[in-house]
From Swiss-Prot:
InterPro entries: Glam1. The gene is glam-1. It comes from Caenorhabditis elegans. It is a multi-pass membrane protein. The chain crosses the membrane at residues 19-39, 42-62, 76-96. PANTHER family: PROTEIN CBG09921 (PTHR35013:SF4), PROTEIN CBG22618-RELATED (PTHR35013). The lineage of its organism: Eukaryota, Metazoa, Ecdysozoa, Nematoda, Chromadorea. It holds the Pfam family Glam1. This is Glia associated membrane protein glam-1. It is found in: Membrane.
Amino acid sequence: MSTQIPMDPPKFLCMPARPLVVGLAVFGAIRSFVQFWMSSGFGMAGTHFCVLLLDLLLLFGAYKNDVFALKWSQRVTFACVLIAIIRFMIYPVVFASYMASGLSRNFTGIDSEEIEILGNVTTPEQNFVFGMISGFTLEFATALSIGVESLKYLLVHRLWEYAKATEASSSSRYVIP
């Protein structure tokens, strides 16, 4: 008579955790690739490339679904959370300063609709408001990024615990003579 406790695969709300992690990793890899492709500076391209590699490692770990790969995926998602926090501290301030100072009007790679919007902003007060709104918008987006990366970390941790428990239960079958 077996007295095993049934273990259900981990879930987030009603969704299974593993397909959700795979989906988030694929979305993150695509997003990072697009940001890498469209970045103009070496520093920005480097951070996007690092996040792209980390998302691909996370995808491998979620696909492989063993204890070792999931532990490394957990470390990778922790690194992504740290990168998102660093982005949260730097990007909104730089972008808001760029917009508020009026330097954005000197950029030649913008569309005619954006030129019309920027052309109507002429006073220092309007520059300040424009910079503040753009900074808060970017701050919201980076805070959302931190939330998604933290959710991935939580899900990978649950998957790792589940894989560890199922591996331990499958290897601890005693043969009673």
